[in-house]
C-alpha cells in the first residue's frame, strides 16, 4: 500500500507540471488561422477532388479568401457558389466549367473487378467498399462524382453514370421570374 501511495506522490506533481507546461505552450504557440478561409472551407463540399485546380478544399478556401474566384467547384455546384457569394458579399458567378453536368456517381462492373483496392485508396469520401482480391462496389449515396477512382483502376471496370431522376434526386424547374412578378402584382 505504501508503494502505491509513493508512486502517486511522485507521479502526481510530474503530471501536473507537464499539463501546465502543455497548456501554456498551447496558448503561447497557437497558430492563428484566417477566419474567412475557415468559414469558406466550411461551405465547400469537402470532397478533396481537385477539380478546382487546388489539391483540396482547404487550399481552395485559402485562395478564395485571398481573392480567387468562387466558381471553380463543380461538386458544390450553383448552391455552393451562391453560399460563397452571400458570405463574401460578392455577385454569384456561373460555374467555371464548360457546362454544368448532371450529377454522376461511379459504377463498378463487379464481374471485371480484380479487387486491387486502388480505387478505395483514391476515393476521398470512402464511398467504395470491398476487400483485397474481392469485388468492390460503390455506395451511391456517398459518391460525389469526383472521378478520382477512374484513373488508378488497372482494368478499367469503373465508369461514371448519371443519376436518374427519382424521388430522392428530383429537381423541379424554377418558376419564371415573370410568373412570380405577376403573382406579386395581384397580391398588392
Curated annotation (Swiss-Prot):
It is an enzyme of class 7 (translocase). SUPFAM superfamilies: 4Fe-4S ferredoxins (SSF54862). Its cofactor is [4Fe-4S] cluster. Residues 104-133, 134-163 form the 4Fe-4S ferredoxin-type domain. It is found in: Cell inner membrane. Its EC number is 7.-.-.-. Keywords: 4Fe-4S, Cell inner membrane, Cell membrane, Electron transport, Iron, Iron-sulfur, Membrane, Metal-binding, Repeat, Translocase, Transport. [4Fe-4S] cluster 3 binds at residues 123, 143, 146, 149. [4Fe-4S] cluster 2 binds at residues 113, 116, 119, 153. Coiled coil: none annotated. Pfam families: Fer4_21, FeS. [4Fe-4S] cluster 1 binds at residues 49, 52, 57, 73. GO terms for cellular component: plasma membrane. The keyword Cytoplasm does not apply. Residues 1-26 are annotated as: Hydrophobic. One of its GO terms (molecular function) is metal ion binding. Its main location: membrane. Residues 32-90 form the 4Fe-4S domain. Binds 3 [4Fe-4S] clusters. It comes from the Bacteria. Belongs to the 4Fe4S bacterial-type ferredoxin family. RnfB subfamily. NCBIfam families: PRK05113.1, rnfB. PANTHER family: ION-TRANSLOCATING OXIDOREDUCTASE COMPLEX SUBUNIT B, OXIDOREDUCTASE. The complex is composed of six subunits: RnfA, RnfB, RnfC, RnfD, RnfE and RnfG. Part of a membrane-bound complex that couples electron transfer with translocation of ions across the membrane. This is Ion-translocating oxidoreductase complex subunit B. It comes from Pseudomonas paraeruginosa (strain DSM 24068 / PA7). The gene is rnfB.
